[in-house]
Amino acid sequence: RIRQAIEEGENILIYGDYDADGMTSASIVKESLEQLGAECRVYLPNRFTDGYGPNASVYKYFIEQEGVSLIVTVDNGVAGHEAIELAQSMGVDVIVTDHHSMPEILPDAYAIVHPEHPDADYPFKKLAGCGVAFKLACALLEEVQVELLDLVAIGTIADMVSLTDENRILVQYGLEMLGHTQRIGLQEMLDMAGIAANEVTEETVGFQIAPRLNALGRLDDPNPAIDLLTGFDDEEAHEIALMIHQKNEERKEIVQSIYEEAKTMVDPEKKVQ
């Protein structure tokens, strides 16, 4: 169905999530589809106005106003019955790629790509959303896309899935790719975090890179992250990385204020049971 959409010049919407896994997942699919010549755009929902997962109003807007005729979800979708039903009723196919817990009743999507799908026998069930997106990318391009593994490593570590089995391999090679990444946005982020590219580890991703991306999704519009991760404009990458850095500082201030407030609620004379 995706190949058909590309061949016929259809407008494809990649609908992601506002966390680091969703951002990297969407970037992976975007780059893969564009390699095949697709007309596609990415939308990451705003947690304050759109909520989590497929949003019927957003789907309707893109179908009616942007002429979208195929929607591919990444890192969400298995619980999006209402939005997917709306899209299908409007003649728009939805392909779900997700890794979250499977509901008893699955949405009536065109296809569902999920490591725990009851009709599949995929041997490793604990992929992150970006891992599932990477599998889709490899299938579409008919070869392993090693240049995408830096994004896979970030999303997998950020989502705190089990770093065993296939995830361990994806992260290992992804960290190697991060060590000499050509993504100017990641280079800017590493620079602002004071991390040399060749010193990137699981810890630096988990405690420096992932929190920055997550801060954007938690406090503001997450969509600039796509331009950061996939763009080629040095000035734009610097501006977005700086904005994300500032959002992360804001996040830390909020966390600290909550901590200080919580401390005032605790009676120091009272023993914890």
Where are these regions (language model features)?
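Amphipathic alpha-helical transducer elements in NTP-driven molecular machines
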Residues: 81, 106, 127-130, 134, ...
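Hydrophobic helix-and-loop "lid/oligomerization" segment in the mid-to-C-terminal part
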Residues: 1-70, 90, 141-273
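Short hydrophobic/aromatic-enriched beta-strand-loop microsegments
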Residues: 40, 93-96, 112-114
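Hydrophobic/aromatic ligand-binding patch that stacks against planar heteroaromatic rings
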Residues: 32, 83-86, 136, 154
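Catalytic PLP-binding core of fold-type I/II PLP enzymes
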Residues: 84-103, 160
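Short alpha-helices
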Residues: 28, 106-157
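Short, ordered loop/turn segments at secondary-structure junctions
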Residues: 17-18, 45-48, 76-77, 99-102, ...
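Short glycine/serine/threonine-rich phosphate/pyrophosphate-binding segments
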Residues: 20-26, 73-83, 129-130
